[in-house]
Amino acid sequence: TKTADVIRDVSTDKSQIGILYLNEFNEKVLTKLFRDAGLEFTELFSCGAYAYVWKNHPLANREEISIQDLQEYPCLAFEQGNSNSFYFAEEIFSTYDYKRVIKACDRATMLNLMVGLNGYTLCSGIICEELNGSDYRAIPLEQKERMHIGYVMRKNEIMSPICRKY
């Protein structure tokens, strides 16, 4: 889901919550957008960034990896539609000058490109094998930028029981 869509869906009551991340680069802009939309951000946890690769990627056996190590491989990023501001990018390091970037709209395409092209994406390191299978690895990045994972809700809204369970 596109970041701008998450903000719009929560602010218009289409969704009760939206899961997003803040980092040093996007925090001021997104916090202002949350405020303007009547939303508040609640941090769940913070974490470092990871490179997400196919298990047979040439770098898959590394214990840690740098952005420079990944230069020769295509970076896979989620398409952000008309809201293509760097601040809306779902991937951390959105301003880094990657040699090759391929944009996709869905997880299945992303996973296929990881296998077919030895591509990678950047993520929080939280991997759900039930969704993605066991053929992928998350490798910590040497860069120590923090991601603050959390949710946005409309201000003063009480979380529903189903939302709380989620």
What are these regions (language model features)?
Residues 35-42, 46-48, 108-158:
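Beta-alpha-beta core module
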Residues 56-65, 143-145, 156-163:
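Short helix-loop capping/hinge motifs at secondary-structure junctions, enriched
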